[in-house]
Amino acid sequence: MTSAMVLTMVLCFALTISVAVSIGLASLVGIQVSNVNMLIAVKEMFSSINKFPLAAIPFFILAGNLMETGGISRRLVEFAKSLVGGVQGGLPMTCVLTCMIFAAVSGSSVATTFAIGTILIPALIKHGYPTTWAAALQASSAELGVIIPPSIPMILYGVSAEVSIGELFIAGFGPGLLIGGALMLFVFVWCRFKGWGKSDGEGRLPVGRATLQASWALMMPVIILGGIYGGIFTPTEASAVAVFYALLVGLLVYREIAFADLYTILKKSVISSAVIMFVIANAGLFAYLITRAGVPEMIGVWLKDVLHDGNTFLLGVNAALFVIGMFIETSAAIIVLAPILAPVAQFFGIDPVHFGMVMVVNLALGMITPPFGVNLFAACTVARISLDRIVTQLLPFVAVVLSCLMVITYVPSLSLFLRDLVYK
């Protein structure tokens, strides 16, 4: 059964069929081969998405779309530019910093790409940066949208591996700040080497004025994350608070959202949420079938026999996930692989929260690597260029994130320090 499912999925990928449909067709083959009752299959698909923590996904997506339409993202850009825009290469640094701030409320890298990219990619091009480099920068920076909490992949890992989502969220700050800081340092040095960005400080608002204009926007991550870690509400409840706050600010404070806009915003959010839920439902059925066949246990035993220590295990997992992330959508990969790999990681004495950070950061790289990197498609859409034109420009950014991944992998305290401080 397992061989037939894998062969079907590989064939579907070769035919460029979407990931969700490929996994669904592979599961259908598995059902036919193993004579599983179709009613059980439907039940498993429904059970995969009928989980309270997953309700946070559509809420965070809606909050991100409200922020984009309501002027919050534009004010965050001006605030970030006031802080770092005065140096040579300040505009690319503004891009990274804004993505870090926006990530603290959106939970999605694609939402971050569109919300920030529509503002900053044209600005970068106007200031003389190559279009291909601007798109590569935005795609890479937006990866922080799923690393800095709240994060949709962290929610999925928490549900799949039965790990506290609150602990995962707070553990994400260390890796997120490391990657954000490394990207900012890289673009600062690169722009000086290339002689780019000498006029980036033009039109920059004073810090005080920019902070005042963005004060309502800046309060959003404070309220959401402060509420979670202060024990006021759960991550799922926080997502609903994010929607309410973004709607309130967009309608009544900044007044950039009209009631007529709500239909378009809701429609866009529903479509994005449905795509993710469809992936989760199909991946959940796939995971059920391979678990029923005993595949996780077989893989676990094999890994324990072949790999003799945690460091070797992490190295092998990183290599495998990097390749898997290029071809399989992040959500599907986490749902299928987390229940298999997390118990093995615990066997080797690796904290499940730390392992979650390794998985999320590694698979997030798949969002900026060809051929199926969703951030690349989003950034290229905004920049109006083809995907093949930015591949070479991506290499330095991928190298920076890979270097950070190695630090995150082998320095667990980077992820666990804040978690231990708050939860233990």
Regions found by a protein language model. Give the residues of each.
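Alpha-helical transmembrane segments of multi-pass membrane transport proteins
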Residues: 1-424
